[in-house]
Amino acid sequence: EETRVISFHGYGPGPEGIAWKNLRDWITENCYEEMVETQRFFGFNNPNPSPGSENYGYEQWMTLPSAYEGKEGETIKTLPGGLYAVGGFRYSTPEAFGPAWEALNNWRVDSEFVYDESRQWLEELLTKASVLVEKSSVDFDCYMPVIKVKA
């Protein structure tokens, strides 16, 4: 099912922190702290890291209530629905993401699904308390868009 999100971007050697700071600032500046418990938080590299460069981008999304109309200057997007394979993990260092994605991809190789390149892979933050206060260890789910090809 389609979902509307607000988008924040970061770019540099640690873009996740920049994107999260932009989202946190927007939440506090607009007094939307009460929305944190009822919304979902997704992120992904955008653009991906390039060989030889420590700089890359990260885009952070927060789902929006259906009644939210948006304000001038906000980037509102629609996340398409579809089928995703999901794998969860606990994050304590940035290096934790690689093995989590590798495990999900290894599952896919032997499954009845193929990667759906038309949709974005996502990382969903599950530890809501860390949205407003940065935590060193949080729970994430990795979402790989897939299409079922085998019966």
Residue spans for each PLM region:
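A solvent-exposed interaction/effector surface
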Residues: 1-151
